A protein has these predicted regions:
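Polar/charged, compositionally biased leader and regulatory segments
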Residues: 3-5, 20, 35-204
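Residue-level detector of beta-strand face positions
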Residues: 11, 26, 89-91, 200, ...
Length: 250
């Protein structure tokens, strides 16, 4: 789409004794004294926020003592337009104190602006890759271009003691009949009815196959399969090493 994306997640703890509502998040080049690069309004924040523990909220509110995770997918027209470093100004309002609330709740301001979330972007040139499929009728979606949380960007889980966007760069490829705009020919409860079924997959670049799992049973379309251990969460898959620490997983 001609856009360069910077993808990350902001973790914001409300340690105040009053519920908070994020009204804007400014991205600021360099440090807090730099130029404002972009502003996310309250509606955009709400569409991309979930609470720690994996619950999408649909709001920009952070209850007392809870941590919100704001998924950021910032698009830029060129590599040169991306700041080498940037931070954020989170602007939030607090709900009115309640009579039975903590003693210091009434002393908090009604609105605050907090600087945080410092980011250093990579200086590496992004790896150019090819398509993992061939032929016509392929539709790529649920990726970085989504304006709101999707089936991948809301997969925020703890890995190795850190909150991780486990499917941050995932893309869904769906094969459709352009004339009918459908993805199946037959019973949609059967895998073999899907136009993408049994189509060949291609390496997206010169690579080494470093992992193959093919022993798990197929799942029923549009249903979440039973997972006994975390290692089964991905299902059957292939991992390619593209070099330079870059992996591709199918």
């Amino acid at each position: 789409d001609g856009v360069y994306y910077v993808a990350y997640e902001l973790t914001i703890l409300n340690d105040a004794p009053r519920d908070a509502t994020m009204t804007a998040i400014e991205t600021i080049a360099d440090d807090e004294h730099g130029a404002v690069v972009s502003i996310a309004d309250q509606a955009q924040i709400a569409a991309n926020t979930l609470l720690a523990g994996g619950t999408p909220t649909g709001t920009a509110e952070i209850p007392v003592g809870r941590t919100a995770i704001v998924v950021v997918r910032a698009g830029y027209p060129s590599l040169e337009a991306i700041p080498a470093t940037f931070t954020h100004r989170v602007i939030a309002t607090f709900a009115p104190p309640t009579p039975d609330g903590p003693r210091l709740a009434s002393m908090y301001p009604d609105e605050v602006a907090q600087i945080g979330g410092f980011v250093t972007t990579s200086t590496e040139t992004p790896l150019a890759i090819g398509a993992p499929v061939a032929g016509d009728g392929w539709f790529a979606n649920n990726s970085l271009e989504s304006a709101a949380l999707n089936a991948h960007s809301d997969v925020i889980i703890p890995v190795g003691g850190r909150i991780t966007g486990a499917e941050r760069y995932a893309i869904d490829f769906l094969r459709i009949d352009v004339a009918t705009m459908t993805s199946t020919d037959g019973d949609p409860a059967l895998n073999e009815s899907y136009l993408a079924f049994d189509q060949p997959l291609l390496a997206v670049a010169d690579a080494t196959v470093v992992r193959v799992v093919s022993t798990l049973p197929d799942v029923t379309p549009r249903q979440i399969g039973t997972i006994d251990v975390v290692d089964e969460a991905t299902g059957n898959h292939v991992v390619l090493d593209l070099g330079g620490g870059v992996l591709a997983m199918y």
